[in-house]
């Protein structure tokens, strides 16, 4: 008798995706982050659901309701900090997942890559709206500054901003709609994840060499499930250490001050995972130019398949490209540091140089060095 998992219409889909899926035998731990992102999404949806049961999206009571969750709800503080730090873990895994894709040439699977970029934008939008909900000082001013960027769009900008705000400033209507969208978006993300996997399973996974491995496949279960389980254990350990020992390590102290439209914080800055993009935004003196650079800093990923000039897919055997890749990583870390610094000398010039280097590396230097490597290898 055939196993039910191979015949039942529903189980068959799960089986073909998680059990009998042919997977390259050579994929390293860098391929763990897809499953870790799935776990992160699950944690965020669950903790978010329970938090939503106690949260009120009203400017008068939002801050108080978060305080109530932390003080009066059974293990409410665990839920709140799991959700806040879970977002940080989500972005760490996201950045590593995208970095893996860049290093090993996974962007050659264009459909999977483009759905991934959509997912990145959706997660960033969700995280931004979630940061507004506790209605602290940084929540309010962050929402004001970031939504105000849309006013740089010619002709329709001002009307667009007021339409998003639901009034003439960030107020009750803004908070209510941000809560509604923050609740809805994770389910859209879950649907996009299924599409992402659908496209991935059409082509099969890439591997560190970048060479097709159709002749060397192993079943996903048990080989990669046990490997993923180790990654999950490590990630959950780090998350629990953050939650239980230093839950506010990655947060901003200003967000413990209730939102006050009459008092601007000395340094308005987003959560750490947006600082690199914020630094690029601030490095351009022109408002519209800054907004375009901000969007392009992520959208540039969509150009990766077009900018691939090497005859090899992966960077595994391309030492010169590897040097530029790690320079890009160092540059992004520099931008993250600059994004959290005040707008004064020498941080302004460092931010501008790091922004120029970021775009130069991706658009000019990496494609050129790939052509040079082809020439050196007489290809």
From Swiss-Prot:
User: Where found in the cell?
Assistant: Mitochondrion inner membrane
Q: Which residues are listed for a ubiquinone binding in this entry?
A: 201
- Binding-site residues for heme b b566, renumbered to this chain: 97, 196
Which GO molecular function entries does the Swiss-Prot or TrEMBL record give? metal ion binding; ubiquinol-cytochrome-c reductase activity
Entry's cofactor comment: Binds 2 heme b groups non-covalently.
Question: Which GO terms of type biological process are on file?
Answer: mitochondrial electron transport, ubiquinol to cytochrome c
Q: Where are the transmembrane segments?
A: 33-53, 77-98, 113-133, 178-198, 226-246, 288-308, 320-340, 347-367
Main location group: mitochondrion
Q: What are the annotated GO cellular component locations? A: mitochondrial inner membrane; respiratory chain complex III
Its domain of life reads: Eukaryota
Which residues are involved in binding heme b b562?
Answer: 83, 182
Q: Which UniProt keywords apply?
A: Electron transport, Heme, Iron, Membrane, Metal-binding, Mitochondrion, Mitochondrion inner membrane, Respiratory chain, Transmembrane, Transmembrane helix, Transport, Ubiquinone
Pfam families cross-referenced by the UniProt entry:
Cytochrom_B_C (PF00032), Cytochrome_B (PF00033)
Cofactors required: heme b
- Which topology term describes how it sits in the membrane? Multi-pass membrane protein
- So what family is this one in? Belongs to the cytochrome b family.
Briefly state the protein's biological role.
Answer: Component of the ubiquinol-cytochrome c reductase complex (complex III or cytochrome b-c1 complex) that is part of the mitochondrial respiratory chain. The b-c1 complex mediates electron transfer from ubiquinol to cytochrome c. Contributes to the generation of a proton gradient across the mitochondrial membrane that is then used for ATP synthesis.
Record's miscellaneous remark:
Heme 1 (or BL or b562) is low-potential and absorbs at about 562 nm, and heme 2 (or BH or b566) is high-potential and absorbs at about 566 nm.
Q: Which PANTHER family does the entry mention?
A: CYTOCHROME B
Q: How does it assemble?
A: The cytochrome bc1 complex contains 11 subunits: 3 respiratory subunits (MT-CYB, CYC1 and UQCRFS1), 2 core proteins (UQCRC1 and UQCRC2) and 6 low-molecular weight proteins (UQCRH/QCR6, UQCRB/QCR7, UQCRQ/QCR8, UQCR10/QCR9, UQCR11/QCR10 and a cleavage product of UQCRFS1). This cytochrome bc1 complex then forms a dimer.
Name by which UniProt lists this protein: Cytochrome b
What is the scientific name of the source organism? Rousettus amplexicaudatus (Common rousette)
